[in-house]
């Protein structure tokens, strides 16, 4: 169901941030979703598995950073694609924070950079 896919999208994004971002940045910033755009091209049944792949399609705009998550079935076919927009907040103040180069560096190259 739709809510399950949204939960998986958030889990994948969170895992990517946790595994790539520095400890300092993880302690200083949090992310909130401002937009989900999800395309459904297939479904999975009970007992079937999917594989998720995530990447950053382009650099940030101010406090916002887009992310793409594709889910593939066992045959490798993309069955769900999601484009999500995240906003970065300063953990202490809860205020929007411009996404700086040192925050983005570990996630490069972006898809639009070849």
Where are these regions (language model features)?
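Hot-dog-fold acyl-thioester-processing enzymes
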Residues: 1-35, 89-114
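HotDog/MaoC-like acyl-thioester-processing domains
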Residues: 43-49, 57-114
């Amino acid at each position: 169901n739709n809510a399950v896919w949204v939960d998986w999208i958030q889990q994948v994004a969170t895992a990517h941030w946790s595994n790539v971002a520095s400890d300092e940045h993880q302690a200083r910033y949090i992310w909130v979703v401002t937009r989900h755009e999800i395309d459904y091209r297939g479904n999975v049944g009970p007992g079937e598995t999917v594989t998720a792949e995530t990447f950053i399609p382009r650099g940030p705009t101010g406090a916002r950073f887009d992310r793409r998550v594709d889910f593939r079935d066992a045959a490798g076919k993309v069955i769900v694609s999601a484009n999500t927009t995240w906003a970065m907040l300063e953990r202490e103040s809860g205020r929007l924070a411009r996404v700086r180069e040192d925050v983005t560096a570990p996630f490069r190259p972006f898809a639009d950079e070849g």
